[in-house]
Every structure is written in structure tokens, then in C-alpha cells.
Regions:
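C-terminal engagement/docking regions of AAA+ P-loop ATPases
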Residues: 130-209
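Conserved AAA+ ATPase small/helical "lid" subdomain
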Residues: 91-148
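Canonical AAA+ ATPase core
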Residues: 7-8, 12-15, 20-98, 102-111, ...
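Non-catalytic, well-ordered alpha-helical scaffold segments
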Residues: 14, 61, 78, 115, ...
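Walker B beta-strand of ABC/ABC-like P-loop ATPase nucleotide-binding domains
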Residues: 1-2
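Alpha-helix N-cap and coil->helix boundary residues
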Residues: 55, 76, 96, 112, ...
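Short alpha-helical scaffolding segments that buttress acidic/His motifs in well-ordered protein cores
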Residues: 80-81, 121, 175-180
Length: 209
């Protein structure tokens, strides 16, 4: 768990990128393999820019999704009040062990995906690149093949969590924004026109919706 990852120095970010990419780290010339499963969950504060280091594109691409955490609703905030200010000590409870998680990951990869869903993934990701067919010069740089891989895994996992035997195009549309938005940047003209990445993704989704 990397808290406020954009406050880490570029050298630290580079070391993390090696771990995410190669599943091992190197210390004093010695290689140390990381345990399996290995996951990186990271947070960053989008409101404070002073003292931060923007993550490079290569590192952003290593994250499966980017999820914005909004303010909690009233009921959730009420639970937070009572659960964090009482005298009872709250302890984290394990929901699964490593073996179960690895088995679940394997099951996700075995879930069948229909041709229509595959084509929707390819069409959406390829449309999010600069100078894509029908593009209107909004995108400065866009998602690579890893975005297609991530979207394929994400829709499979969502279907499995919902108790379905295969993902649907609705899964592709619902997960497009969190999978793609950190893998894209807009042109200066698009930003000057007030466009945002979520706006552009919503526009791209209409082509396959």
C-alpha cells in the first residue's frame, strides 16, 4: 500500500516500477523475488500539487484502474463516526488468504469472453489513441495494449463477482473510464476548450454503446 505515491521521489517511483514490472527488486546488486500474489494499491491527493512528482506514463500504465474516491454519503459517514471514535479497538479481518486469491485470479483468466465483447474492448481502446479513425484531435497520447489486457481482465472479474459466466458489453462500458483515464492525456486545445478525459471517454463509449 503506497500512500500519496505522487509524493515519492522519482528514484523511489523507479524502484516501485521495477517491482511492478519484473516482480523482483534489486538491492546492492542482489536480486530478491517478491512473494506471490503481489499487488500495489496506491493513493494520491489530486488537490495538492506542491511537493509532488507526477507519475511517469510507464508507471501509470502498470495500474489496472484509477478510482476516484468521492465524499461518503450520509449513512456511510454516520458509520464512520461511530466506528472510528468509539472505545472499541477495530481490527482488520482477513477476507481470504493468498492461496484463495491466486485461485480466484486463475479462475478469472479462464472465464470465456464472447467475440462481441472482445471487439468492443479493441474498438474502445484503439479509439482512445491519437489520430484514431474518426478522432477529432482531442487526445495527446492514449492507451497501449496493456489497457486492452486490463479491460479484458476487469470485465471478467466483474462478471465473476456478479455470478455471471461471461462478461457483457455493459461491463466494458461501465469499466472503461477507470481503466482508461490514467492512460490518456488531452491536447492543449482540448483542455483549453474545457474538455476533460471523462468527457472524451463518454464520447468514445457512444461508438460502441
Amino acid at each position: 500500500m503506497a500512500d500519496e505515491i505522487n509524493r515519492a521521489s522519482p528514484r523511489t517511483q523507479s524502484a516501485l516500477l521495477q517491482a511492478m514490472q519484473e516482480q523482483h527488486i534489486t538491492v546492492a546488486g542482489a536480486r530478491h523475488d517478491l512473494p506471490k500474489p503481489f499487488h500495489v494499491l496506491a493513493t494520491q491527493n489530486p488537490l495538492e500539487q506542491e511537493g509532488t512528482y507526477p507519475l511517469p506514463e510507464a508507471q501509470l500504465d502498470r495500474f489496472l484502474m484509477e478510482i476516484d474516491v468521492d465524499y461518503p454519503d450520509r449513512d456511510a459517514e454516520r458509520r464512520i463516526l461511530f466506528e472510528t471514535t468509539g472505545a472499541d479497538e477495530t481490527l482488520a479481518k482477513a477476507s481470504m488468504n493468498a492461496e484463495i486469491l491466486i485461485a480466484a485470479q486463475r479462475l478469472v483468466r479462464r472465464l470465456p469472453v464472447g467475440d462481441s465483447v472482445v471487439e468492443a474492448i479493441l474498438s474502445l481502446v484503439r479509439a482512445a489513441r491519437p489520430d484514431a479513425d474518426g478522432g477529432d484531435k482531442l487526445i495527446a497520447w492514449g492507451p497501449g495494449p496493456r489497457a486492452s489486457q486490463s479491460l479484458m481482465l476487469a470485465v471478467r472479474a466483474r462478471a465473476l463477482l456478479d455470478g455471471r459466466l461471461a462478461p457483457s458489453i455493459d461491463d466494458v462500458l461501465d469499466l472503461a473510464e477507470p481503466v482508461l483515464k490514467h492512460r490518456m492525456a488531452l491536447t492543449f486545445a482540448a483542455r483549453a476548450d474545457g474538455r476533460t478525459i471523462p468527457d472524451v471517454i463518454r464520447q468514445l463509449k457512444t461508438r460502441i454503446g
